[in-house]
């Protein structure tokens, strides 16, 4: 895998007219046994920044426990704190036909289903030089999407806060019940380095345009 335990990546999030709307950190916390599965433990945390924070106080954390072999999701945890409202949820994803493990009520999903965070790391694991397209079911805790990823450019220069990099450009489109989700699309650039570091994400969503860029060299 291109990522390693202990990896921490920090990003600056720009939204609408706000160049520093939020800070995002992505972390490969550990490899661990979860109910008999060998898993990667991924974590993403997002915190709104001033002046946006005066309008939208957001402190969210997402944890993904992803199979080390198949990269399908076994457990997805959401710890949301948004504008005074808190919500914690633990989702135990079980492929149809398999038995549940543990005491958490299972969510039955198609084999190979990822959660959003685990899916992002799965995109890093792809060899985009030899796999131009990748389709995967993604469950976000509420809705199930068919995510279709495609290589748009094998190599191009990308400038972010962390520096200038050669990168592969990937487009992401979301489908639900066979129809493309309107006004929602993503572009992602992965560096041409052994870690395939995510450098930049451009998102078009109903809430507006979002730019997420690597803020500093990985550590």
Give, region by region, the residue ranges found by the protein language model.
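Hydrophobic, well-structured mid-protein blocks that either form specific transmembrane helices
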Residues: 83-126
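Acidic, serine/threonine-rich low-complexity disordered tracts
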Residues: 1-94, 128-219
């Amino acid at each position: 895998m291109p990522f390693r335990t202990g990896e921490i990546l920090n990003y600056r999030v720009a939204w609408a007219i706000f160049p520093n709307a939020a800070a995002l950190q992505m972390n490969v916390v550990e490899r661990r046994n979860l109910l008999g599965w060998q898993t990667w433990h991924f974590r993403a945390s997002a915190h709104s920044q001033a002046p946006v924070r005066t309008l939208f106080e957001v402190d969210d954390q997402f944890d993904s426990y992803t199979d080390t072999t198949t990269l399908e999701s076994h457990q997805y945890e959401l710890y949301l704190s948004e504008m005074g409202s808190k919500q914690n949820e633990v989702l135990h994803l079980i492929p149809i036909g398999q038995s549940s493990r543990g005491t958490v009520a299972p969510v039955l999903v198609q084999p190979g289903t990822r959660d959003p965070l685990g899916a992002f790391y799965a995109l890093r694991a792809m060899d985009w030089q030899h796999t131009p397209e990748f389709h995967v079911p993604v469950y976000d805790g509420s809705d199930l999407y068919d995510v279709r990823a495609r290589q748009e450019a094998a190599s191009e220069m990308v400038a972010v806060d962390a520096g200038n990099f050669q990168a592969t450009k990937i487009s992401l489109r979301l489908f639900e019940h066979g129809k493309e989700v309107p006004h929602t699309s993503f572009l992602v650039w992965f560096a041409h380095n052994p870690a395939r570091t995510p450098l930049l994400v451009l998102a078009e969503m109903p809430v507006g345009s979002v730019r997420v860029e690597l803020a500093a060299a990985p550590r």
